[in-house]
């Protein structure tokens, strides 16, 4: 009698696990409601989420059209490069991320004055390059190169590496989706600077 009960209990447990595991696995890979497979940032967002680099903004949303803040970017960089952030709330984790990203040399001191501000393209790309150890050489070092501002030099390299479009504006604010694309590219591609 005990054997029958044990076998029945074991069979029920196996059946329950068989039903739960595929559902849990598909839920983990399902992505975000506001990032359809047709979105330019889909592959990048899914990659960053699977690697636990990027979280959504709640309610199964990533908010790819929302502007990325200094705090959000700093936390993503810390997670991507294995730098620990501390805190029990998002505010604490964000603050810790900014401090750690500054310590690593990925953000400059202005990040402390406006951690909740959106980031412009040249600052975000410069930060991504700093984290990935991608050098940015002045354009005057190249044959026929003209003198450019720091921001324009950063975007020049970003364009050469395929991280920015030819018409990208150095001062344009970056969305969470665009930031995901840039970070995904920096993490998964190898770059050759000539």
Model regions: which residues?
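Intrinsically disordered, low-complexity serine/proline/glycine/threonine-rich regulatory regions
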Residues: 9-13
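Phosphate/pyrophosphate-binding loop motifs in nucleotide- or prenyl diphosphate-using proteins
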Residues: 52
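Feature responds to low-complexity, polar/acidic, surface-exposed segments characteristic
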Residues: 3, 14-40, 55-174, 187-194
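Positively charged n-region of N-terminal signal peptides that target proteins for export
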Residues: 1-7
């Amino acid at each position: 009698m005990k054997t029958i009960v044990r076998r029945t209990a074991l069979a029920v447990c196996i059946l329950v696990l068989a039903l739960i595991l595929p559902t849990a696995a598909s839920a983990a890979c399902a992505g975000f409601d506001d990032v359809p497979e047709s979105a330019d940032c889909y592959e990048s967002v899914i990659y960053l989420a699977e690697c636990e680099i990027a979280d959504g903004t709640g309610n199964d949303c990533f908010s790819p059209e929302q502007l990325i803040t200094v705090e959000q970017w700093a936390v993503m960089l810390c997670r991507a490069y294995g730098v620990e952030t501390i805190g029990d709330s998002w505010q604490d984790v964000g603050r810790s991320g900014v401090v750690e990203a500054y310590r690593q040399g990925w953000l400059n001191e202005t990040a402390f004055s406006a951690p909740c501000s959106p980031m412009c393209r040249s600052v975000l790309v410069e930060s991504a390059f700093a984290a990935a150890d991608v050098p940015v050489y002045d354009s005057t070092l190249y044959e026929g190169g003209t003198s450019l501002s720091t921001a324009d030099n950063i975007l020049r390299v970003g364009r050469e590496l395929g991280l920015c479009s030819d018409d990208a504006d150095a001062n344009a604010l970056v969305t969470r989706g665009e930031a995901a694309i840039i970070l995904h590219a920096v993490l998964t591609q190898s770059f050759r600077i000539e």
